[in-house]
Curated annotation (Swiss-Prot):
Gene Ontology cellular component annotations, sorted alphabetically: plasma membrane-derived thylakoid membrane; proton-transporting ATP synthase complex
Organism for this UniProt entry: Nostoc punctiforme (strain ATCC 29133 / PCC 73102)
This protein's name: ATP synthase subunit alpha
Compartments, as annotated in UniProt: Cellular thylakoid membrane
Gene behind the chain: atpA
GO MF: ADP binding; ATP binding; proton-transporting ATP synthase activity, rotational mechanism
Lineage: Bacteria, Bacillati, Cyanobacteriota, Cyanophyceae, Nostocales
EC number: 7.1.2.2
């Protein structure tokens, strides 16, 4: 029996099959791991990878394409990558690193990728920003003109900082660099400033102590902590400062004032050096790669005071650099000094002599901050830096001279009292009116007959007296930010009256 084949049936069956076929064809840029180790992977086959593109490995680890070479791609891993092995497949995602941003981050501790690490649950944020974004241009900025009060008398008087400024805090280890940064954050309590503290390559216990201090002082209500501790991959330690800048940038473009602390950029440079050497990039001075200046300049240039048209927001950056035996002429310190608008130099000799904060006024400078200093502070602080510098010179000279004339002795005595005046305990920032009153007393001779060891108790008592007794002066300076005739008269009266009670009690 012959089977008759009807062409129309065949064509309808084929038609049906074609209509039912719905499998999508996806084109993916996939490569193969040639070599992996030390947080670095070499990948073959990713011909279309972009510089800085995120790559996804078989085990879910994310990497960043860094070296685009002729026959392979060098990528850095953002995780342990323990299950990645030779022959594993890698997919290019077509995306560049970005993090969630928004109000939900305030009060939280996150890692370098914006993921919460404080055990308080997920961060619900609908917005995200690229970790690397261009700095504001010339037209987008305006000059620094508003003060960023640190609450530390020595800094606010001699090395003032303005909103939108980049001021380097530099010194040897254990000289109080982080303490200055934390005090500055605590002092922003009433100022409507969003603070971002970036901990790079530090011990996890140190970061926990900082967070605890901020919580105790009520500062976590307006602070975000970004932490890439010493145990994390070098890639995350390198990315953490950019993450901090991105979070602050979100608020800056919303018209808010922000403060970012990078603690510290020496460790970021070391992490970048480690990555670069493992990627076989040619080393330069101190084995750092040739573009180590650029990693810091592109980060710190993102700090700015925005123009009125862009909402008047600002990002103030306080990068920290650790020196070895006070050597500020090393590679990374000189790089960052040249990028920033001034530096606060902390001396281990002053610190060990009990002068804390151990600010060395001779080589500390603020290039733009004086324009932002309040009128009241400008009036009293003008002479103090010069007097302290002269005191340091005279003190060195007095060690060799046996008989000094009265004028020199008086200058030495006043210098000692000014030195005492600027001492300040940790985590106790002062308001502007308190700083102005203390400095006014010092430079106008009110302390000349107070014994040096009693200066601290005199200033503490004076602050209490101004809070409770003579409120006219405090309110005047608070509202006008200037030391007018009325405020000065009230301050003189308060100083004279307080001095009588202090002497009577002594």
């Amino acid at each position: 029996m012959s089977i008759s084949i009807r062409p129309d049936e065949i064509s309808s069956i084929i038609q049906q099959q074609i209509e039912q076929y719905d499998q999508e064809v996806k084109v993916a840029n996939v490569g193969t791991v040639l070599q992996v180790g030390d947080g670095i992977a070499r990948i073959y086959g990713l011909e279309k990878a972009m510089a800085g593109e995120l790559l996804e490995f078989e085990d879910g680890t994310i990497g960043i394409a860094q070296n685009l070479e002729e026959d392979n791609v060098g990528a850095v891993l953002m995780g342990e990558g323990l299950e990645i092995q030779e022959g594993s497949s890698v997919t290019a995602t077509g995306r560049i690193a970005q993090i969630p941003v928004g109000e939900a981050l305030i009060g939280r501790v996150v890692d370098a990728l914006g993921r919460p690490i404080d055990g308080k649950g997920d961060i619900k944020s609908s917005e995200s920003r690229l970790i690397e974004s261009p700095a504001p241009g010339i037209i987008a900025r305006r000059s620094v003109h508003e003060p960023m009060q640190t609450g530390i008398t020595a800094i606010d008087s001699m090395i003032p900082i303005g909103r939108g400024q980049r001021e380097l805090i530099i010194g040897d280890r254990q000289t109080g660099k982080t303490a200055i940064a934390i005090d500055t954050i605590i002092n922003q309590k009433e100022e409507d400033v969003i603070c971002v503290y970036v901990a790079i390559g530090q011990k996890a216990s140190t970061v926990a102590n900082v967070v605890q201090t901020l919580q105790e002082k009520g500062a976590m209500d307006y602070t975000i902590v970004v932490a890439a501790s010493a145990s994390e991959p070098a890639t995350l330690q390198y990315l953490a400062p950019y993450t901090g800048a991105t979070i602050a940038e979100y608020f800056m473009y919303k018209g808010k004032a922000t403060l970012v602390i990078y603690d510290d950029l020496s460790k970021q440079a070391q992490a970048y050096r480690q990555m670069s050497l493992l990627l076989r990039r040619p080393p330069g001075r101190e084995a750092y790669p040739g573009d180590v200046f650029y990693i810091h300049s592109r980060l710190l240039e993102r700090a700015a005071k925005l123009s009125d048209e862009l909402g008047k927001g600002s990002m103030t950056a306080l990068p920290i650099i650790e020196t070895q035996a006070g050597d500020v002429s090393a590679y990374i310190p000189t790089n960052v000094i040249s990028i920033t608008d001034g530096q606060i130099f902390l001396s281990s000799d002053l610190f060990n002599a009990g002068i804390r904060p151990a600010v060395n006024p001779g080589i500390s400078v603020s290039r733009v901050g004086s324009a932002a200093q309040t009128k009241a502070m400008k009036k009293v602080a003008g002479k103090i830096k010069l007097e302290l510098a002269q005191f340091d010179d005279l003190q060195a000279f007095a060690q060799f001279a046996s008989d000094l004339d009265k004028a020199t002795q008086d200058q030495l005595a006043r210098g000692q009292r000014l030195r005492e005046l600027l001492k300040q305990p940790q985590n106790s920032p002062l308001s502007v009116y308190e700083q102005v009153a203390i400095l006014y007393a010092g430079i106008n001779g009110y302390l000349d007959d107070v014994p040096v060891d009693k200066v601290t108790s005199f200033t503490q008592g004076l602050r209490e007296y101004l809070k409770t007794g003579k409120t006219q002066y405090a309110e005047g300076v608070r509202t006008s930010k200037a030391l007018g005739d009325a405020e000065e008269a009230a301050l003189k009266e308060a100083l004279t009256e307080y001095k009588k009670t202090f002497k009577a009690a002594a």
